[in-house]
Amino acid sequence: CAFLMPFVAKAQYEILPFGDVIRTPIKEKKYTDVEGTPYLIDKWSKGKVTLKNGKRYQYDSLRYNLMDDKLVFIDAGKMMHFAEPVAEFEINDGKTGNLIYKNGLPAVDALNTSSFFQIINRDKIGLYKKVSKSITESKQYGSAVVNKTFNTTYSYYSLKNGIFSKIVPNKKSILALFENKENQLNEYLKSQKVDFKNDADLEKIFTYLNK
């Protein structure tokens, strides 16, 4: 018989039977002629999922497809995606740990409220990261062979007072967000070795300035 097992973390997750999830089988698109992977992490990874209806699940087989911005999972050897809308998910990248993604943010550029963003910091003034993939084509001089590769791009967005804006993370853009905290930022940069291209460093800066 089906049973529930509690999993205690920052929020309460439950390991529910797969039959509880409304899922839709999908046929995986094979990019056999493209070098690289369309996924955030090529292997199946453990993670947690929160649906918009509030239900939470823990999985051993999640992958995030960056080409179509969809979260997929394996059930009985078949690839599925969630028929019910996903609000947030957490996935282990096997390197830095768990990465948390959410949607429902304001539409910006060519992105809409269904687009997933990695949460770098979600304090009052937040920072989010969009990871995207596209296919680029190239060929060597004198060759008719076209080489296709997946190209990964990273974009950062700030959320302040309901306004979602693309930024380049650096001292100038951060000061523009935290207008009255130039002294605090200067003190922080003097005492800490900061790499503005490092997500962990950016998270710490935003946490510090949001105090």
Predicted regions, residues:
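Solvent-exposed, flexible loop/coil residues
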Residues: E35, K43, L66, N198
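Aromatic-patch recognition
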Residues: L40, G47-K166
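A short, solvent-exposed beta-edge/loop patch
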Residues: Y141-K204, K211
